[in-house]
C-alpha cells in the first residue's frame, strides 16, 4: 500500500478501437489498442494526467504502478495512464503482420493514436481544460513523448523524454564509442582472435568454445555469431548497472585480467547465456523475422525491423576503424533485411531517414516544455538533445547525468542510487512541478481570477 491506498485495486485494463489508417478518411478498418489506467492517486475532477507512452514492445500493469513518473503522480495526485504502441504487445493488426498490413505501422500513426486516445480518455473521465496532461517515455517512446508535445502542443502541456533518440540515423556506428577506453584494445583483440579462428578454418573449435548449436561454416552464420557476441558488450554499455548482466567495469575487469582475450570472451559469453547452446543459424533468424502470424506478436523483432527500414535506421555497424567489435557487422549486412523481409529498397533508406528528421526536427527540434534526459555513458545520447538553446528557452530543456546509462532516471527512487541520479530526478520533479504550477496560473488568468 502507498499512502493508505492499494494502487493495484485501482488499475484497470481497457481497449480502444483505433483506425488502422488515421490519414485515409475512407478507411474503416480498426485495431484494438490496449491501455492501463490507475486512479489510486487521482484527485477528481481537476487533477493532472500523466501519460506513459509505450514503445517497441508490450506494456504492463507495472507501467502505472511503479517508476519515477508514478512517484510524481502520487505527489501531484495525477491520473495515471499507459498506452501500448500500435502493432506491439496485444495491440496488433487483426489481419496479421504481413508486409502490406505493416504499412500502417509508423511513428506518425502512433502519434495520431495518442491524439485519439487523449480524446477518448477525456470523454470517459469527463476531463476538461482544467486537467493538465504530461507525457513520459524512454528510448523510442521517449522520442514519441517529445514528438507528441511537438506535434500536439494543445493536447499535452509538457513532456519528459528519457534517453530519447530523436534523430534518425542510417549508420549509427557512433553507438560503439561509449565502451570504456580502458578495455577497448583488449575487446578488439578478442574479436580479432575469433575472426582469425573463423577465417583460418577453425570453425569447429569456435563452435565448441562458444557452445554454438551449429558449426558456423556459412559466412552468414559467422556474422550471426559475431553479432551475438557483440550484443553482450553493447547491452552492458547501454544499461551498465541498471539491472543488466554486469556493469562496464565488471566486464572490463574480466577482459583485462591475465588470461587470453579470446578465452575471456568465451567465458563471458558462457556465463551470460541461459540457452543450452548459441543458435547462430542466419536462415532460422530470417525465418523468425518472416513469421507474420499473430502468435508471434510478443516477439517484437519483425515490427521493429520494419520501423528501422522505413523510418529510423539506427543500424549499429562496425566498419569504423574505432569499432572494437567485428568488421563483419556492416551496413550492407543490416540493411539487406529490408528488401528481403519487406521489399524495401536499400537505396531508398537515406531518403526515408531524411524525411523522419525533417518531419520531427532531428536533434535540433524547436520544442517548448520538453525535457530531454540523458545519461553520460548511454550510447543513444548521440542521437538525443543534450545541449540547451539558452537564447530561446526561459528554462533548461536538458538534463545530463554524467555517470548513468540508458533510461536510468525512469525507475523509482532507491537508496543505492548515485548522487548524480538523485540530483537529476529532483531536477525532473522540479520541472514537472513548475509546469503544473504554470498551467494552473494560466488557467486562472483565462478565467480572469
Place the predicted regions along the sequence by residue.
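Alpha/beta-hydrolase fold nucleophile elbow
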Residues: 127-140, 144-145
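Loop/turn elements at helix/coil->beta-strand transitions in domains of secreted/extracellular proteins
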Residues: 46-49, 76-79, 129-132, 154-157, ...
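A catalytic-pocket lid/entrance helix-loop region that shapes and gates access to the active site
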Residues: 154-254
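Short beta-to-alpha linker loops that shape the active-site pocket of alpha/beta-hydrolase fold enzymes
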Residues: 56, 84-88, 93, 165, ...
